[in-house]
């Protein structure tokens, strides 16, 4: 089966970084997937009255913002098209509009039709964060968060953050296309952060992966006062990891997203691509 990945591109109030186009194409190319890029542009409801329209010229200002958003979407889709053409990746594109408060919801609903979701990430980009969290919790699909600060290379070394939980198991299953193509897999367990269901859970998962013909090993680390997200990323980078796979902890509460400690720690300082499953 050929996989199809979706890439959500934000245009308001912040735009997705142009680097996301190259990183997304690099990811899908490695698993032989095609790419569907969606530019989400803003549709601002007109709530002005006659006086505010006269004094502030709100209708024209709204049209200017919407026009800028559409132009941004076109520019981002063109950037993805160039990267896809150069990388030999099959691409389809789409532009959808949504009110500001619902842009994340629209992104998550569109993502449900694909196998894996890609989202660019900048720590100070509120639109990117809203889209990423909405897709993670609302799409029902694995979400790969792509850091703006790094170029995605070959994802040859996959690091699995393993605590024996349901969401971690879901993430391992969702990462199968990447695990099958990895030259090295390392299962990492943080032993001093919370009670674990056993002492050898990392090796047990690694053994199961080896039985399936994959090159997997296990390692135990300690956070030693660091956040678990920091500990996982630092160890992944130390051993040459290219992709971190982990469960996405947290829940949604009337569009306010409450992230678990590990997930929040990862996203607050993203240093490498992370596949999250909820």
Region locations from a protein language model:
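Structural beta-alpha unit
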Residues: 1, 42, 78-117, 212-244, ...
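Small/aliphatic-rich secondary-structure junction motif
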Residues: 1-60, 138, 154-221, 241
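Gly/Ser-rich helix-loop-strand patches that form or flank binding pockets
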Residues: 21, 26, 30, 105-151, ...
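Hydrophobic anchor at the start of a short beta-strand
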Residues: 35, 90-92, 143, 185, ...
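Short, ordered loop/turn segments at secondary-structure junctions
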Residues: 40-43, 98, 122-123, 148-150, ...
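A short acidic, glycine-rich active-site loop
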Residues: 59-75
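Short beta->alpha connector loops
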Residues: 97-101, 123-125, 165-166
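Generic hydrophobic alpha-helical scaffold/packing signal
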Residues: 176, 206, 210, 233, ...
